[in-house]
Amino acid sequence: MEATKQNGMNKDQFWNLIGRAKEVCGTDLEASAVWIKQQLFYMTSEDVLKIHNLVYSYRDAAYKYGLWTAAGIMMETGCSDDGFSDFRMWLIAQGKDVYLNALKDPDSLSGVTPYGYCSFESLGYISSQVYSAMKRKNIYQDSTAKMQMESYEQVIRDIVYHPMIEYPLELPEAMVVYPKLCECHLSEQARQAPQKVKTWNVSRTDIRRMMARGNAAIKKMQEQGAKAPEAARSVRKGTVR
């Protein structure tokens, strides 16, 4: 037994749980899911609810086009909408430092070894399954919008976002902004002719607009002969679910 029933789940305890799962289970995601589920059954239902809100708050705080760009490069086969959701769950499972560093600089993912297809969809289901077993009700009956917002606001206080993280980038631009990640995961063919690889749905107006802004920021950076500016804290709030 690793946990005892006690109230007071917070961000530090959440990350301790995630870190311990990584220590115990390594890269075995199925074993990690089983282990985390076992630990949650030793907790109070109130703490299980808090964990649920924290998992989804961290997932939503990572919904950034720049990280999505990096995920597609790291996965080497591109990254769909659902794939990016599962990638963010996988990123959470790598622990606090890897998660926060990836948002501060997605290029830091060059130092993270991919495994399990960089996908951990089941992490999002564990708390709801445990809560349902404990309370005989759906967790969303008790997870209020106010709780979710409070959880999200707590989460983003610790996050420093990379200045280019809002922008979806095609490979030529990604090679400028995330050079180490591209060096690790792009094929020689892709590195030689990155303009031939298309990863974004440019039929969407919002994607085209954000790509244009990102390209303009890169052009300005190159004209000034400077490296990517230091990451700055973002005050923009994401989606709370």
Tell me the role of every PLM-derived stretch:
Residues M1-E46, V197-S203, M210:
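N-terminal leader/targeting peptides and immediately adjacent processing regions
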Residues D12, L49, N53, D81-S85, ...:
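Non-catalytic, well-ordered alpha-helical scaffold segments
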Residues A21, Q39-M43, V55-A62, W90-G95, ...:
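Generic structural signal for hydrophobic core residues of well-folded globular domains
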Residues E30-A33, G66-I73, N101-D105:
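Short coil/turn segments at secondary-structure boundaries
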Residues F41-C79, F84:
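A glycine-rich, hydrophobic loop/mini-helix early in the fold
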Residues I73-L103, L109:
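Hydrophobic/aromatic-rich, well-ordered segments within soluble, folded domains that form packed cores
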Residues Y99, D105-T113, Y117-S203:
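Basic, alpha-helical nucleic-acid-binding regions used in initiation and control of genome expression
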Residues M211-R241:
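Non-Sec secretion/translocation targeting segments of pathogen effectors
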